[in-house]
Amino acid sequence: MITLFTMERDYPYGTLRSTNGSKTKVVLEEKGLAYQTETVSPGAVWKKLPEILAKHPLGKVPWIEDGDLVLYDSTVINEYLNEKSATNPLLPTDPAKRALARAL
């Protein structure tokens, strides 16, 4: 099972979320892949705590763990997830249309 590490925290005035983590969550849902979410505190990310840096060198969210594979950077993660499962492809097969979709 894939584990998505992202940042989310509720405050009295609203919720702080990782936009990139939210994008990855949408991809996981659209692809129908089994996953679990682990919430990382904003302070741990902002301070680049050693336990975060031990997971990957950038110390940012989101990142995923899929078995022994650890990926970070939402674009890389989302491309991997799209290619991992042929179900519900997220990009067109035509190269020009695919490039335009990526530009969005």
Regions found by a protein language model. Give the residues of each.
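GST-like domain detector, emphasizing the conserved glutathione-binding G-site
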Residues: 1-104
